[in-house]
Amino acid sequence: MKIIRINIPCLIIIILFISCYRNYNAEKITTVLELEKITKSDVSALQKVNITDVENSLQIAKLNLSKIEEKKLDTIEIRLIYFEYHNYLNCVNKLYENSQKINTLKNTLANNQVQLKNIKSDYKNSRERRGDLDKHLIYETDIVKETSSKVFNTIKIINEEQSKFDDLNSKIEEILN
């Protein structure tokens, strides 16, 4: 009976140590799940961008810019349209640059998802504290945050420039007609 009483506290201590290790990995798994949620949200946000509208705007701009180049404008006309033309070019360039970023961001997000899945799997399949994975998790956290910021900024710029394009394009088309 005395041996059982001595072993019970030892068993309790062992159970506490085991639960601490599992809780540590559980905390890291929770962090990975949160990062996966952010990445999934970013993927969804990029899918909502109407890239067809952007491509159509770029095609219209290409056509209008070629018409402007073909048109023989005198010095007064050039001065009158300079600001609209300049703003139009800036808008079109920003639309183009940011539309090109979308595929890169999609690839980055796909890589992030794979990395997070692998890290989560490593934490889940380990029965011990995985300090060796901590630096990878910190690194991946930084990458996910940076990518999310890039996604947000790219979408914001595309939406702003698409709105500007509609206004500027009508002015350019007035000049052409």
Model-found features: residue ranges?
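Bacterial N-terminal signal peptides that target proteins for export
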Residues: M1-C10
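Short, well-ordered helical secondary-structure segments
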Residues: N7-I8, S41, K145
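C-terminal motif of bacterial Sec signal peptides marking the signal peptidase cleavage site
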Residues: L16-S19
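Immediate post-signal-peptide N-terminus of mature secreted/exported proteins
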Residues: Y21-F83
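Generic signature of mature, soluble extracytoplasmic domains
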Residues: L65, E69-N107
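Extracytoplasmic electrostatic interaction patches
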Residues: L89-N90, K94-N177
